[in-house]
Amino acid sequence: MKTPILFVVVVAVLIVTDSAEGFKGKANSFLKPLQRRGLEEECCQETCSYHEIWENCKKLCSDELHKMFVEICQPPTEKVPERD
């Protein structure tokens, strides 16, 4: 009688553990782009004032962020070049 109960408990633990790992993976895959986007936005916003920094940081910006910041951020002396 103990064997079927033990089997059920082991299977239940495996299912719960697998579900938790799946949830953790989904949470991480959802959070990583948000964290990266936050860094990109911060970097791009900083570049509004400094053209040299823009040149270095625009490589980190996603295409959509780059388009948005090209419209918003114009260096004091020259136009921000289009992304390659």
From Swiss-Prot:
Segment forming the signal sequence: 1-22
Cystine bridges: 43-48, 44-73, 57-61
Keyword vocabulary terms for this entry: Carbohydrate metabolism, Disulfide bond, Glucose metabolism, Hormone, Secreted, Signal
Highest taxon, organism lineage: Eukaryota
InterPro entries recorded: Coagulation_fac-like_Gla_dom, Insulin-like_sf, Insulin_CS
Positions of the pro-segment in this chain: 23-37
Entry's localization field: Secreted
Family annotation (Gene3D superfamilies): Coagulation Factor IX
Family under the similarity heading: Belongs to the insulin family.
Record's function text: Insulin decreases blood glucose concentration. May have evolved to activate insulin receptors (INSR) in vertebrates. Molecular docking studies reveals unique interaction with the human insulin receptor. In vivo, insulin-like peptide injection reduces blood glucose levels in two models of zebrafish diabetes (streptozotocin- and glucose-induced). Also shorter swimming distance of zebrafish larvae, an effect which is not observed with human insulin.
Protein name per its UniProtKB record: Insulin-like peptide 05
Organism, scientific name: Exaiptasia diaphana
Lineage, uppermost ranks: Eukaryota, Metazoa, Cnidaria, Anthozoa, Hexacorallia
